[in-house]
Amino acid sequence: MSSKKRKSYFSNSQLPKRKKLFLQSGMKGFFCTSNGKEKDCIREALNLLDEQYSKICPKTEENEFRKEDIERELEKEVEELKNRCFSDNKPFQVIETDVKSCVFIKTTVNDHVKLATSIFTEIKDQKKCKSKFLIRLLPIEITCKAYIDDIKKAADEIFDVHFKCEPTTYAVMYNHRCNNSVLRAEVIEALCVLVRDRNLNHSVELKNPKKAILVEIIKG
């Protein structure tokens, strides 16, 4: 018999399959679009978000280094992968949209809009593209069903923060995919009414608004 120490191996079959999470009302996160290669898009988006999140909210505990033998490291890696599959507390989770080239990443980060903005600012300042398959990444403050009443209710929940303020300019940017039942003009008019309810002196500015209301509709 060989006196050499046996190596430990593990395969993907040892890991639980990732639970599929589906898009629901009341979520917040990031809406991502890809060039068709969704897995690569997800990888880039998660890496980008994790990297920026660690800069804004560094975890000193994760910087501690401990020497462990190979078997211990492998056991730890398997356990971490299992926890990643089932943990609901992790900051970023991929959500199924059932729409090709569209990905939603749910987040528990408190100010995820600030996180996204910091990514945009860094890319602009460094003049360096950080993704190949991730085409767009938009912070989403709230999700709802694709019905006009649900859209109005969701907007009403978040508009006080953005429009109970001094007069400003704004624009509604509307996009839809796999849905023809929601009328663009109806959505824009309804949201403009809600904005004016906060301050009658807010005005629409399509070319260079100070605030933008992003509406992304996918499916029905």
Language-model segments: what does each one mean?
Residues M1-G220:
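SAM-dependent transferase fold signal centered on methyltransferase-like domains
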